[in-house]
Regions:
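An N-terminally biased module of ancient metal coordination in phosphate/nucleic-acid-related enzymes
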Residues: 1-73
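Extended substrate/RNA-proximal surfaces in nucleic-acid metabolism proteins
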Residues: 54-123
Length: 123
């Protein structure tokens, strides 16, 4: 029998709908043997997913999806696996990316508000 795996999963720490532990339970229930949590620009959910995975004897690979811009308008998403989620420099970089994303999101909300669409960041 082939080993089922999904190596590109987002949790509620980025744009996913399920918490890391919920993802582990969901994929375990669907007979996956390996998953990777690869949230956008953060590794905050990886440790809790790995703990849940250990309890269910399922491999959870540490991962991240980093957004970057190559040249002027070429946006890239780079997936990283087996990363050190406790690396201080990684934490610094992801915090910078988080602040930039929050600033961009606020600007988008302001544009939408001027067009008559009132939304909050939670929306």
């Amino acid at each position: 029998m082939a080993l089922k795996m999904d190596l590109h999963i987002h949790s509620t720490y980025s744009d996913g709908r399920l918490k890391p532990v919920e993802l582990v339970r969901k994929f375990h229930g669907e007979d996956y043997g390996i998953i990777a949590i690869t949230d956008h620009d953060t590794v905050k959910g990886v440790a809790e997913a790995q703990i849940a995975g250990e309890a269910l004897e399922m491999k959870v690979i540490s991962g991240i999806e980093l957004g970057t811009i190559l040249e002027e308008k070429l946006k890239l998403h780079i997936l990283g696996y087996y990363i050190d989620i406790e690396n201080d420099r990684l934490e610094e970089v992801t915090e910078i990316l988080k602040k930039a994303r929050e600033k961009r999101n606020q600007a988008l909300l302001e544009v939408l508000d001027k067009q008559g669409y009132t939304l909050t960041e939670a929306d």
